[in-house]
């Protein structure tokens, strides 16, 4: 079945119930220059004449409007309808490039005006001959991919960071009310006695004019329990584009930039930066590479042996600011390849910590409200924090926190050094207790990360914190103020020191070692908590296996320790991605506890909509047990059922999760949705699939919920054209969306359904319609092409009393 993406500006119209008028034009394949063809070669006896004037003029399309992919300097920018018109003198068909289109795709209009290449103050709809006005520019049309290829010298292109998305494309979505639900029912049978448990978790939302109202709540109950409804939190938020941030009001969790303070629950207002609005290379710390080129040179930047960036630079000093490293650590190798073939290389250290950001980048957070946690006193609080890139290698951060009888100040610096990424900060707190006492102290934190390329050793995070006895976090201060603490003393453990270490070592292909270790000590209790885990993982062909040992130790008055050994293996039973997997996992501890789990899991259909699992377990204390499970992913929900049985107990678990979306077009059921999601409409066409979501289909009214979209980034919504029936045609199977955070973005795809009807055409004079003539409807869309016997096959949703009128407009 053909999928059409063209819309033509011809004088045509269609009338249902009375008549249908179809205009016939001619559109023929492209040639690169004017050529004359002998039409007799294509004629057969009794067949229609062939009109080849478009071939002879070298055109690839006929005049009209086309939905095309617009590329600027080989980078896909957007999809848009572009008008193609014919020159009345030459007959050449060319795209009309508007002034507004050049602005939208990132051409530097101000510089073009300053260099007097275009007049000032042109209207957005003013057509421009780009190739003639801008030296070195060109506009080409690739009919095979329906792509408009615009080439502009880099001097006249606005410079944006990698991953930049024009904020004018941000879409707040449609007005929508939705609920994301998770329902579970569990029945346990122990020694013949049944007990049930029911749970319904809801994440509700309402979107209106860019505002997002959200509520998290749940309903639970069961045997011997009263049904209980609880609302965890309710809040409203919206983005503040000018500040590249989000404003939130209601029941919130504070967010301190640079992790200056702990996150606490409050009722109030919060304004904080949203890094999702930033380009990719501004989200995290990115290095700036500087050097000097002697000629027109190529600069390559490599990390861990892979080229991650390449660009051409003119002679002289250069500065590269849009590098996006492939990992958080690993020195960069910069190679300068001169025009005469000479090469020079040097290395630049790069280690990244989450607190670090690029030069000039500011992240901020402001919060004001009332501390709110069940069972604890409520106090007013005010908090502010910020992270700022001071230079290419130094980031500064800090914050202030004030509450009733409490205040804290944080200040720190992050460094990118040849020895690795390092940050240090100190927090000073002052608080008063309910008994009138005064606490004052400091907490020092050090973080370090480094990758040694020569040995492929990565110190992912090495952290150390030390707090003096008088230091308090806000939650510890609130605990000191509580009635229970006033009567019996504080029950919370106040941390004195903590050290954490994570090391990863690559050995060879698919094999690696890891080590994690840590120790924590406390002021108000003796002893310490220690934890160490060491592991090895590898694979043989498609099978994978791992070994690990873990030890925990609590020292002091109630000291205890335990060491566990684990081994696991997973083997696929086939070569495809949907092949079933056989797995086994064994665990043993120093106290004699041991268990063995073996099982199989996989899918039952090609679309991976039905999944299954079966498992057999052995436990030294619990004996033998087994379980089976089934899952079914539908367009409207995800369903699951599991049954397990042990020596003395049985359990049945049923689950369902999904979403209900109320929108201007009605009510649509879908799979569980994320923070930002989409709504796809193919009017009145059911069963249409979406690429990337094998189990999602449009319902009978043509709606489907697209479960996940990435905010502030290009999201391509693609219909699975293989799921369209032979009686359905769609003009464009791909659309682009850039949702704001929390938006419900609606995308409508124009589709036509009907029966295939064949017309045998002839002129009043008795002559045939030329072979290759195209037919257009009143929507200016291609509906068919005349064959060599003057027949036209179209998709037509006709009524009983409908008729069709056809006018032929030969190309001149």
Predicted regions and their residues:
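Short, ordered, surface-exposed loop/turn motifs in non-cytosolic proteins
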Residues: 62-84, 684-693, 765-779
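Transmembrane beta-strands of outer-membrane beta-barrel pores
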Residues: 156, 185-189, 210, 219-223, ...
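Short, acidic Ser/Thr/Gly-rich low-complexity loop/linker segments typical of extracellular
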Residues: 83, 694-703, 780-791
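A short, amphipathic beta-strand motif
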Residues: 70, 289-291, 678-683, 755-764
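Short Pro-Gly-centered beta-turn/loop motif in secreted/extracellular proteins
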Residues: 88-97, 323-329, 703-725, 729, ...
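Extracellular beta-sheet/turn segments enriched in Thr/Pro/Gly and aliphatic residues
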Residues: 147-151, 354-357, 670, 732-754, ...
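Post-signal-peptide, soluble extracytosolic/periplasmic N-terminal scaffold domains
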Residues: 2-4, 10-16, 21-25, 32-283, ...
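Feature captures outer-membrane beta-barrel proteins of Gram-negative bacteria and organelles
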Residues: 168-172, 196-209, 229-242, 378-392, ...
